[in-house]
């Protein structure tokens, strides 16, 4: 198996030892208290919000019919989480993937992003990205009342959940009778660059025995600086490193996630209800990129580590761009009894939008450059000419403007029916769902000249700000400075630059997809003396159609429509065995199917009859099919306490990765004879996918054993050891993208005297990011860690109002995120962003 070179920093070794010392200390403390006075059975009950949230989450887990981890709303409020990825990343076996430090994707039990399905209040949400991949940075944490992270799925859950199914429960008017509300305001600073941090949220509801209404809104906004050293290509020789190219960036980022929603309910006298629910979420990211690229490949007789390039070349790129992801959900539903049945009907309209627009002027230059790459992670490059005086030469960039852009809109309509009843064995449930999706998108890099928009290279230099050196506390390898990118963008727009429409997309990048999924299921819960058994069967029928291009006899592009249909029977079985009142065993066998993403399976492609090749989408991809086994032991040994260990195994066939395969060339061009095999480069099916691991979870509190000031201490610890593998189309064996061998979370908290303090540490080992066809060794992210501190003070005793003041301190370790190719000697991206601090107040009534 191709694996990254082992490289554990002293900081990580110290963190691992610290975790071990913490566990040892906790064990000794409990042993001492028990030996001296025995376990205290009667304690004084006091208001402890961390304890209340732990009780809520643990009891929900304990009473579930399947293997699940639960996050309560109170627990979310006790951590400095700004989106759902951060909140879920604290659960056992759940890891976070970040972009510029922001939690964005989830690797659920070490699985690729697309193996996790997501729902709001039981309504399945297609992936904002590629139709399959959830973007969790689009969903603020404050909109949720509870999160159910299902690790072993039942038949009433979507079959797409290979690794897990995350059901996000939002607030309902009937949660609290009468008028209720809450608000949150926080402000702070990002220490690198001094950017502002602002948080706002509010919720208001009313309900009685006839109707209920609820409205909410939230916004979190951050101004951030990111320093990024990437794409440093080097050759390792005896005596050191010879650099060839390097790109260094400094980003000024202004990003926000927003959410708003409303619910109206009318209650029937018979016990049913009819309701309408609306949810709108948006992630918006404005980004200024200041980039220098240096090319040293023309050096004659280069020397390792240090040297001089008399004729180095490169370019400078200046961008003011935007990324936007939105999710809009409208649901009309009703719940009502019919005879002995409880019936639920939902009709949902869902619209997803994902787009980016990056207009990018870039100018070429040539100059002498002295280099020092003795430390490849902190290189230094010195130009002969001061950067402010460096002239941009059209010889080195004839094309000096490119308009990068892309957009995908997905419309989804769902009809969902569920009904359950009691029978002689226990409970029986059945249901059906019709799911229709339409996706339309495209992307391009439209090249041009600044002169087309009324700008010269000299005019661009007028926007430079040499006195504004890059904000950085780590590296500025060239002494870079900022440019007024926003002013330059405004000038480009005034000159006619626009966000293009799909008619300007590259033909080989168009995404046109229609998909229909019909699902039926039935499940029987059998109640027994020892617990319960749940047997289920789900059937999913998929019709997939995509439109792309083929060549006619004259070599012109004409539409090509490819349709695929497949059906999947997905059985499942769950056993819950209560050993006694405190301990429980669980065992599950599940099956699932992961469909190709829209971009992967699009029919559009570039066609080359001369090379007998096709590059682009692969509409002939097979869906990934899996079966899995879960075993779990849960010990609820004290109030708000748990020790749990679980083991899991997943076998996945037809693993989809970037790569090459062969197709019938005559489908794409009459130049090929029927059956003639051409090479298709894009996505392909691998084989022999396997994912297995062990998870540990421990939560305990000293107030289960003692009273007094020290009884306020407690710990939350979880750990996952995971291994995965698959065989790529080229025959090489890799770990599955997203698998870290080791992940863990450690939290030490104290709550007493209206104060709650929580120190949290998160760690994940290195993991494979991509298996791009042109990168034989794969791209990996190196190990990552985060240290966070949360402080809360309850004001109710002082003021009579339910309110707290809080402080959140994030990324206190100021950790660098590093990506590399093949092994850690070849870093291709090093990101730093600094710590973040927020103060705020939260109140409710």
How should each PLM-predicted stretch be described?
Residues 84-87, 104-107, 119, 134-135, ...:
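N-terminal periplasmic accessory domains that precede
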Residues 44-77, 105, 113, 123:
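N-terminal periplasmic "start-of-domain" segments of outer-membrane beta-barrel proteins
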Residues 713, 765-770, 791-845:
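C-terminal beta-signal and adjacent terminal beta-strands/loops
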Residues 192-294, 315, 319-343, 571-573:
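Transmembrane beta-barrel wall of Gram-negative outer-membrane proteins
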Residues 85-124, 151:
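Extracytoplasmic beta-strand/coil segments of soluble accessory domains associated
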Residues 649-651, 663, 668-770, 842:
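Gram-negative outer-membrane beta-barrel transporters
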Residues 96, 123-151, 202:
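Short acidic/polar hinge/loop motifs at secondary-structure boundaries
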Residues 310-327, 505, 511-518, 564, ...:
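Outer-membrane beta-barrel signature, preferentially recognizing the C-terminal barrel domain
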